[in-house]
C-alpha cells in the first residue's frame, strides 16, 4: 500500500521523464495550472500569487485546478478533460506544496489522457515559491522563446462547475434494477508505457495500481450482499456503456458540499452552512451533519440512454468513499424491499 507521503503528492509528476528543456509553447500556448497543497501548509492565496508571477513571464495560465478537483469522480475527470481540450490547452504546470518545500513541474497535455508521458517534462524544486519561480524565469531567459501571449487575464480562473447529467434529476432509485444489471464503475488503473519509465518509476506505478486494486476489491466486498445483478467494470462514457447494453451505471462525485449538490441537481440554499446526510445504522437511519465547504463523496446512478440521474431517495453523502458507497447501496436495498 502507498505510504502517506506518496499519496499526498501529484502522482503524474513521479512518472514524467524530466529533462533540461521546457515544454514547447510555454509562452505561446494556453496553460493549465494544477495545484496540490498539503493541509498543514495550505495557502488560500497561492493561486493569486502564482498567477501574478506567471503573467509577468508571459505564461498564459487560463485555468487553475486543484488536483483532487480534477479527480472528483469518473465523470468529473472526463468532462473536465474535455472542457480543457476544447479551450486548446497544450501545456500543464503542476505545483506541489508540502512541508519539504515547493516543486514546479512543466509538462505537456495529452489527447486521450490527461498527461502526455511521452513528452519530456521540466522540473524545479525549492524551499519557497519565489525560489522555484526565479529559477523558472532564469531558465526562460536563456532561451529564444516566441512570445505571443499578450491578453493574459489579471486574475486566475479557479471556479469550474461540472454538470454531471444532461437529462432529468430523480431523487429516487431506478426500480428497473430489479431486472437490469447495474454497472458499477471501478477506480481506474494508471497505464503508462513501461519503456518510458525507469526502475523507480515502474515500482511507483506498480504500487499505485496495487492500491487501486485494493479499492476495487473493497467495492466488490461492499456489494457482496446485493441481491440483484451487478457487474464491476472499468469506467466508460455513457455512450460506450449503452453500446454494450448497460442502461444504468453507478458513479461517484467528490466535491465541496455546495458544489456537489449543484452538480447533482439538488436545490441549493445559499444561506445554509451545513447539510444533513442520511446514513444507515444497524437497520435504521440516522442523520449526520456535513459542513457545506468540506469535500464529501456521493454516489449516484446514471441512465446511459438519456443522461437521467438517480441520486437516491436520501442525500447520503459522506466523508469517505467507502461510507458513501455503503450508504447508497444499503438505503437502495432497503427501499427495494418495501
Q: Which residues are covered by each model-predicted region?
A:
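Short beta-strand and adjacent turn/loop elements
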Residues: 11-338
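Bacterial Sec-dependent N-terminal signal peptides
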Residues: 1-14
Amino acid at each position: 500500500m502507498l505510504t502517506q507521503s506518496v499519496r499526498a503528492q501529484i502522482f503524474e509528476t513521479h512518472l514524467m521523464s524530466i529533462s533540461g528543456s521546457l515544454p514547447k509553447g510555454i509562452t505561446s500556448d494556453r496553460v493549465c495550472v494544477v495545484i496540490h497543497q498539503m493541509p498543514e501548509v495550505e495557502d488560500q492565496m497561492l493561486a493569486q500569487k502564482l498567477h501574478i508571477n506567471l503573467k509577468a513571464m508571459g505564461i498564459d495560465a487560463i485555468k487553475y485546478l486543484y488536483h483532487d478537483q480534477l479527480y472528483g469522480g469518473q465523470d468529473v475527470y472526463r468532462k473536465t478533460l474535455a472542457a480543457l481540450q476544447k479551450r486548446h490547452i497544450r501545456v500543464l504546470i503542476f505545483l506541489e506544496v508540502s512541508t519539504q518545500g515547493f516543486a514546479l513541474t512543466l509538462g505537456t497535455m495529452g489527447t486521450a489522457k490527461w498527461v502526455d508521458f511521452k513528452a519530456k517534462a521540466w522540473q524545479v524544486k525549492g524551499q519557497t515559491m519565489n525560489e522555484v519561480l526565479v529559477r523558472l524565469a532564469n531558465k526562460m531567459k536563456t532561451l529564444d522563446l516566441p512570445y505571443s501571449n499578450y491578453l493574459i487575464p489579471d486574475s486566475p480562473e479557479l471556479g469550474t462547475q461540472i454538470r454531471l447529467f444532461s437529462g432529468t434529476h430523480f431523487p429516487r432509485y431506478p426500480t428497473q434494477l430489479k431486472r437490469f444489471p447495474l454497472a458499477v464503475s471501478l477506480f481506474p488503473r494508471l497505464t503508462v508505457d513501461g519503456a518510458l519509465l525507469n526502475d523507480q518509476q515502474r515500482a511507483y506505478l506498480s504500487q499505485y495500481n496495487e492500491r487501486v486494486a485494493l479499492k476495487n476489491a473493497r467495492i466488490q466486498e461492499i456489494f457482496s450482499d446485493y441481491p440483484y445483478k451487478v457487474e464491476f467494470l472499468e469506467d466508460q462514457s455513457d455512450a460506450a456503456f449503452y453500446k454494450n447494453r448497460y442502461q444504468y451505471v453507478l458513479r461517484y462525485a467528490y466535491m465541496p458540499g455546495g458544489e456537489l449538490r449543484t452538480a447533482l441537481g439538488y436545490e441549493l440554499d445559499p444561506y445554509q452552512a451545513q447539510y444533513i446526510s442520511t446514513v444507515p445504522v444497524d437497520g435504521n437511519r440516522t442523520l449526520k451533519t456535513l459542513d457545506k465547504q468540506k469535500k464529501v463523496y456521493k454516489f449516484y446512478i446514471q441512465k446511459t440512454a438519456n443522461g437521467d440521474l438517480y441520486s437516491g431517495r436520501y442525500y447520503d453523502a459522506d466523508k469517505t468513499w467507502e461510507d458513501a458507497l455503503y450508504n447508497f447501496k444499503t438505503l437502495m436495498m432497503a427501499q427495494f424491499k418495501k
